[in-house]
Amino acid sequence: MTETYDITIIGGGPAGMFAAFYAGMHNAKTQLLESLSELGGQVNALYPEKTILDVAGLPAINGRDLIKAQREQLTQFPLTIKTGQEVTNVTANEVGFTVTTDAGTTQTTAIIVAIGNGAFAPRPLTVPGAEAATGKQLVYSVPRLADFQDQTVMVAGGGDAAIDQALMLEPVAKSVTLLHRRAQFRGLAHMVDLLHASTVAVKTPYLIREVAPTATGQLKVTLKEVGSQTATAEQIVDKLVVSYGYTSDHHTLAGWDIDLAETRNLINVSQTMETSVPGIYAIGDGVTYPGKQPLIATGYGEAPVAVQSIMTQFFPDRRGPMHSTSLTPQS
């Protein structure tokens, strides 16, 4: 017999996890599906050591601790959580949707898509020597600060992630250099101020032209000054962290038998977070609407909107109050 749910949440990152919690507050029978082996999405997979500053009420928290707290929050309700299961198809039927994963099928009244930017992969450094150094001296994330203890580190990139990584590495590394191809950084003004007040050496405007291993197991990074035909420089580092951003792939959506309207690989949603397909809602970094900000905090705000909209539309007899102080977790 096919298991039936009120709400199916696809994607177990911060926004999807909070949507599951809020659905639990409404006593909705809910399943949370995550393709990775554990919950947490990109935060847990790529930025567990990153200090997160934009969650209300928390002066600072790293990604690992944030996801741990959200996992604990979910234990208040009898939610069905399935990790390591990728959704391969969604089909509409007379009572809602059939959700197919690589482990089987379930039935659901409504869906909340919270897959962020979909499948993500780092934008690679495409210069001579980069491929051979990848996974050794050249990395694309900082999952463990201890791996950089007392090392000479270069971070390449000019956005928030690059600045965050440079500042995060400063207390543990022997030295940190932040390399950017422009004179100005794209990060938030506060983070740029913290950067300039730190001991991180800022090197602009330079591009990486080539990397090569040294006899001592380090990496020689050859740089070219932007705007100059001849000016070059070399720097020997223990680790090169490339932070050029991530490419996204919504192949999960493309394989479904329903057509979700997308703009620039982002899902268009209404003010109730509903997509172009009635009964399917979307939240988090993978959606777009006027004024949208791609922040964890924004996803936390979108989750209750989507859940409340579903309860109002499909379960009006038990939509419940809208304030958490009026909602009681199941014992």
Swiss-Prot record:
As recorded in UniProt, its EC number(s) are 1.18.1.2
List of residues binding FAD: 34, 42, 47, 87, 120, 285, 325
Q: What UniProt keywords apply to this chain's record, in alphabetical order?
A: FAD, Flavoprotein, NADP, Oxidoreductase
Do the record's keywords include Disulfide bond?
no
Q: What is the UniProt remark on how the cofactor binds and its stoichiometry?
A: Binds 1 FAD per subunit.
Q: What cofactor requirement does the entry state?
A: FAD
PANTHER family xrefs: THIOREDOXIN REDUCTASE 1-RELATED-RELATED (PTHR48105)
- Provide the family line: Belongs to the ferredoxin--NADP reductase type 2 family.
Protein name per UniProt: Ferredoxin--NADP reductase
